Amino acid sequence: MGKSTLFNCLSNAKAQAANFPFCTIEPNVGVITVPDERLTKLAEIVHPGRIVPATCEIVDIAGLVKGASKGEGLGNKFLGNIRETDAIIHVLRCFDDDNIVREGGAVVNPVEDKEVIDTELQLKDLETVESQLQKQSKIAAIGNNKDAKVAVSVLEAYKEVLEKGQNARCVEFESKEEQHYAHDLFLLTAKPVLYVCNVDEASAKSGNKYSEQIAEIAKSEGAEMLVIAAKTEEDIASLETYEDKQMFLEELGLEEGGVNRLIKKAYNLLNLQTFITAGEMEVKAWTYYKGWKAPQCAGVIHTDFEKGFIRAEVIKYDDYMQYGSEAAVREAGKLSIEGKEYVVQDGDIMHFRFNV
């Protein structure tokens, strides 16, 4: 409850928001900007023509109901939409309101709501795993097919946890072959998840008894969790000026809006980081996966940059702020020249040298 309201705040879209299960039938897709004050501060020094923040795509998918794995409530369609995403943001109702309908009963119960979704996703994954296991077992039995044996090993591990009512993300594989096959299965419960506890305004800062229940579960699962008041975020989004929004947040005792916190959490959930390019034309944030090396990041800008990579000139963001210009950073000896093995760090200001 509250996911379409949150989606509207995140994307400035206007998806229909209401208190019944199938308010959203077709998925609404929005592009959200990742808040990053480093870009603004760099722009104050560089004075670029424009600032280009990093973006993520967010999809508002209809709420699932019990029986979705068997196609009930348009379940097959909704589960197919989830399969196409990289991560799941699970919005849970954590507030009392007699005027808002709850599927399956009147009492607010976010734990039960979570378990309903988990069960439907697990059942769908189990269906996928059993189908593939039957197929791969036959191939493995015919001859010495190494790929099929890897597949069987992965599928049996998944089958064991899913039958216990656990999620596929509980399973970790050591070999690259197993990891690759597991990834290509696109299991629903293998996706990273962020639980968003939608609370009332009075609980926006510290949460409540309902969000505390979800916090315990999230901790046991090693999952991320966030407390947010969707209706309050909607009110904040309707304010015209930055000053008005900050004043509203201060009155609630919050340093940062829930929408910004949610976007940052989602970005981290996907294991994403940002490197920056800064010049007269633009200051731009580029998204890459944590652990990527310089040539891979160069390829984010253009494939030719990766193919013909020579070296990367790197300035740490804090050094740029301290010295006030690229020239001053160079003069202070704080600009480093990095090769192909350099692991790019979040906030690095990069300039790539390449030859094609």
Regions found by a protein language model. Name each.
Residues 1, 7, 135-343, 350-356:
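C-terminal-of-GTPase-core extension/linker across diverse P-loop GTPases
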Residues 24, 77, 121, 128, ...:
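Alpha-helical initiation/capping and key positions within long helical/coiled-coil segments
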Residues 82, 126, 130-133, 152, ...:
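Hydrophobic faces of stable alpha-helices that mediate helix-helix packing
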Residues 84, 345-346:
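Short, flexible surface segments
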